[in-house]
């Protein structure tokens, strides 16, 4: 994957995986099941509106939830890809590994749906107070 957000990098494409990039999914639901919330925490620096919509649509396709009830958080890592499918050259300086970007983002709907379903299936009762 091209390191699109790492200005001091001496290379454009990763030679291997030092630390994997994750998306952690958390599912919260009220006792009545009326209120639902999904929190997704991505190892990305930024996210385009197209990818944001793709992620929310994939969650809404498997869960009765509004897009406003899906919170997307980003770790702000600079070791990741460009921010979207429309920025394949990283603002002009990426010349290697461009062919890896779209397949990476195209894998999001299935992977995110699987992560959310795993979170839903592993939900346990708890009390939240403050």
What is each model feature region?
Residues 1-73, 77-130:
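Conserved beta-alpha junction segments in alpha/beta enzyme cores
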């Amino acid at each position: 994957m091209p390191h699109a957000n790492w200005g001091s990098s001496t290379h454009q494409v990763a030679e291997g995986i030092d630390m994997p990039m994750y998306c952690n999914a958390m599912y919260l639901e009220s006792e009545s099941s009326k209120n639902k919330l999904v929190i997704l925490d991505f190892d990305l620096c930024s996210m385009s509106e197209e990818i944001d919509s793709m992620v929310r649509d994939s969650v809404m396709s498997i869960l009765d939830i509004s897009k406003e009830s899906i919170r997307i958080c980003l770790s702000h890592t600079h070791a990741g890809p460009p921010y979207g499918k429309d920025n394949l050259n990283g603002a002009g300086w990426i010349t290697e590994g461009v062919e890896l970007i779209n397949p990476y983002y195209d894998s999001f709907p299935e992977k995110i749906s699987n992560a959310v379903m795993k979170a839903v299936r592993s939900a346990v009762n708890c009390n939240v107070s403050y």
